[in-house]
Amino acid sequence: MLVLIAGLPGTGKSTIAMHLARRLRATVLRTDVIRKQLFPEPKYTEEEKELVYRVTFLIAEYLLRAERNVILDGTFYKRSLRERVYQLAKAMKTKLIIVECCAPEAVVKQRMEMRAKKKNIPTDADFEVYKKIRDQFEPLQRPRVIVDTSNPLEENLAEIMRYIRSRTKAARRSGRRG
């Protein structure tokens, strides 16, 4: 299974991914972490972004071939990036689950302020980055579950698991894996 967790910075994607990974026995590939491993002081150029996503997709493909569940955790704010995820799931003949994380802007701002005080956080995204990506975000159009991460974590995880079960049942009824 391939799970795409997309959304703006500060919307709780990594928290959802980490907890969901435990339930699905999945490996989480965080674009923030991969970026920091490739570029200790990233410039966020298009070339850097392309390499980060290329490496992310290569690792995901390797894990899917090994029949592992994979969670992709990143903004995936461009339709073209998400299209690559859809193509990967199709090529690997695996189920694709899409989770869109959102949160009220005031909550995001508060999270960003708290995040700025912490050490060893793999993301450099601050509220200015949030606003920039918000303005460039291309809406998701595929079937997905949308979770407001200002709601309790357990409620969101339960909603996601219900969605996964419903997509699994629908795929079985139609004779498809994904």
Residue ranges and their predicted role:
Residues 2:
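Walker A (P-loop) ATP-phosphate-binding motif of ABC ATPase nucleotide-binding domains
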Residues 5:
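Hydrophobic anchor at the beta1->P-loop junction of P-loop NTPases
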Residues 9:
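The conserved Walker
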Residues 12:
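Conserved glycine(s) of the Walker
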Residues 15-66:
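Conserved substrate/cofactor phosphate-moiety recognition/catalytic segment
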Residues 51-96:
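Glycine-rich phosphate-binding loop used to anchor ATP phosphates in small-molecule kinases
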Residues 92-112, 147:
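Conserved phosphate-donor/acceptor-positioning beta-strand/loop module used by diverse small-molecule
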Residues 117-159:
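Small-molecule kinase domains that catalyze NTP-dependent phosphoryl transfer to phosphate-bearing small molecules
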